[in-house]
UniProtKB/Swiss-Prot annotation:
<comment type="similarity">
    <text>Belongs to the type IB topoisomerase family.</text>
</comment>
<dbReference type="InterPro" id="IPR001631">
    <property type="entry name" value="TopoI"/>
</dbReference>
<dbReference type="GO" id="GO:0003917">
    <property type="term" value="F:DNA topoisomerase type I (single strand cut, ATP-independent) activity"/>
</dbReference>
<dbReference type="InterPro" id="IPR013034">
    <property type="entry name" value="DNA_topo_DNA_db_N_dom1"/>
</dbReference>
<feature type="compositionally biased region" description="Basic and acidic residues">
    <location>
        <begin position="100"/>
        <end position="121"/>
    </location>
</feature>
<dbReference type="InterPro" id="IPR051062">
    <property type="entry name" value="Topoisomerase_IB"/>
</dbReference>
<dbReference type="InterPro" id="IPR008336">
    <property type="entry name" value="TopoI_DNA-bd_euk"/>
</dbReference>
<feature type="region of interest" description="Interaction with DNA">
    <location>
        <begin position="367"/>
        <end position="368"/>
    </location>
</feature>
<feature type="compositionally biased region" description="Basic and acidic residues">
    <location>
        <begin position="71"/>
        <end position="83"/>
    </location>
</feature>
<feature type="region of interest" description="Interaction with DNA">
    <location>
        <begin position="522"/>
        <end position="524"/>
    </location>
</feature>
<dbReference type="GO" id="GO:0003677">
    <property type="term" value="F:DNA binding"/>
</dbReference>
<dbReference type="InterPro" id="IPR025834">
    <property type="entry name" value="TopoI_C_dom"/>
</dbReference>
<dbReference type="GO" id="GO:0005730">
    <property type="term" value="C:nucleolus"/>
</dbReference>
<dbReference type="GO" id="GO:0006368">
    <property type="term" value="P:transcription elongation by RNA polymerase II"/>
</dbReference>
<feature type="active site" description="O-(3'-phospho-DNA)-tyrosine intermediate">
    <location>
        <position position="736"/>
    </location>
</feature>
<feature type="site" description="Interaction with DNA">
    <location>
        <position position="306"/>
    </location>
</feature>
<dbReference type="GO" id="GO:0006271">
    <property type="term" value="P:DNA strand elongation involved in DNA replication"/>
</dbReference>
Amino acid sequence: MNSSDEEDIALSRLAKKSSSITSASTYEDDEDDDIPLAKKSRKKRVESDYEEDEDEVPLKKLSNGRAKKQVKTETKVKKEPKSANKSKSTSKKDTKVKKEKTTVKKESKATSTKVKEESKTQSDSQASVKSETPEEDQGYKWWEVNQEEEGDGYIKWQTLEHNGVMFPPPYEPLPSHVKLYYNNKPVNLPPEAEEVAGFYGAMLETDHAKNPVFQKNFFNDFLEVLKECGGCGVEIKKFEKLDFSKMYAHFEKLREEKKAMSREEKKRIKEEKEKEEEPYRTCYLNGRKELVGNFRIEPPGLFRGRGAHPKTGKLKRRVVSEQVTLNLGKDAKIPEPPAGHQWGEIRHDNEVTWLAMWKENISDSLKYVRFANNSSVKGQSDFKKFETARKLRDHVDSIRKDYTKMLKSEKMQDRQMATAMYLIDVFALRAGGEKGEDEADTVGCCSLRYEHVTLKPPNKVIFDLLGKDSIRFYQEVEVDKQVFKNLRIFKKSPKQPGDDLFDRINPSLVNRQLQNYMKGLTAKVFRTYNASKTMQDQIDIIENEGTVAEKVAKFNAANRTVAILCNHQRTVSKTHGDSVQRINDKLKKFMWQKIRLKKMILQLEPKLKKKDSKYFEEIDDLIKEDIEHIHHTIIKRQREQAKKKLERDNEKLKLEGKPLLTESDIKDKLDKIDELEKEYQKELKTGKPIVTKNATVEKLKQQIETLENRILNVSIQLKDKEDNSEVSLGTSKMNYIDPRLIVMFSKKFDVPIEKLFTKTLREKFIWAIESADENWRF
């Protein structure tokens, strides 16, 4: 299922840009002569007939309270007939795949490899998709197959078979004693309304539930559901009189019971869940097993939204099979719908790559079940996306030259187009689009309004708007002086707050202009190009020296530059402070251990303090209170570990039907901990740790060296955590930076790929890991 992280607005300034995008014009106080001849009073405009690229069009209504932006167009783009592309598609055989020319190849090694034989076929009469492990078909390495022969037409597959979607379990009514109270009296709710009330009751103490907008939207939808199911015998009029405390207490009890489950119980539940999900996890594409992405229908609940979303708190209604459209091969067996239900529609559309689809009620948009991120379909899509971005390097200079010249065009539409292209290129803005009144007011380039931009002569611009996830974006940047003049013109009277700055263009026209230079070029491709090019430039200036931890920190700094460019912000997590404190505590513990070892050395060789005073100058750095706290933490942790081991052992004994252990059985262990505590207390008084029998100065110095390396690594980790607390590195790494750059860094700098890619990303970008080498260039 698609999850969109494409709604953020990137306005962060690129550190430095090529001089080719800077105009030589100078700022003038009087700019009336600079206004394009085409600029007149605002007239009614006609909408563009140009259709946006499929990936760029949001599945949301574009209308809002203001009049829809209408744009002058001079020509229309003809849509290529399907037949033209269909002829390019190739029929795939399920017998043997010939030895093909490698397309995603290592730049320095011109090698070709054989593709494993595909001998797996699927019977048309098969009752359901087989549930073997997907590893069976992971021998298929699409990146070693000539992509041109694979075809890039309309036909996406020849055969497709799957088991449909997994629905959430039906609602289980609350125990009879758990009630919603209204005006201090219990209310008997119908099951449908009780379920909705329970959604709010379960999150009573969260920040969302305390949000007035959330409360209002929930209450309106709750009353609507109550009305649909015949009411409850009580007239509920005011939200303030509702008491969810009994419901909240019930759900808290369930949460505590879940936490208290034994490891065996949790394991059993997990295994049952995996067994239930197994049939839906895989499908067969052209006879080859592929993993399915999110095969679950979203459960009903209250919509939270990100940032200041106007629909937060609204009810996400339960989806039934009658609302679901399945897409599969004509000869594939249609999965059985839930008992008593039927599918909304069955399609056999091999020009799309989704498996199921339905419409959700919050934004009235379509939701899809698609192939998993590590599937061949998604992998090829990612590869083509980054290859398209790479091709932009052959056109970017001419594009910049043209839009720089067009910044002074006599036509207002051209001048707006050039200014938008400048902002998209230099500051990685999204093209943007109009938002409805009931959508979060996030902004892109074409949807910038009068109030979002403040001008400070001679060439500074302040952007102040809602960016990704409705997080406020505020930044002051320097722009080309001609761009500054143009923005000043775009803001001139009669424009006022609420009016669009770019009232002669829209995202469709911007993408159309870009596609004049290169097939498939859009604002999104430009954004991907700039992100990857910036990462390449940052890697080029990193020195190949230091420890792995130091190299990872340098990599993260480069990644952070890209994230800032793309405005991938995030709010500081609630646990950030605790996490930083834990790292600081770990640093203090290592420091204490190092000082303790140095004190042992001085007990063995007291004269060393004078001979190497610098080496021992830190032995008094920790105050008594810090040392006491470290002692307490160590003892407490050891006791907790002993008790947890006792619990684990008892769980095992219980399953085997053997007598359980008691604390008396671990008395020796607890006694040793008590002895250690006494030793620490004595050490705190005397300042002299007990030296072990076999200790030597050389051995102690080796231990100190090990600790110093740990201290260095943890210090780097702490700085990295602080630097990235408000920046999301993962978004650019997953969507905008060519993964082959990261693989190149891993191999060139001898950093394990596990340090740079999570397990999920390693699976998603296996094609990059196996195809790029240390010399790869974007």
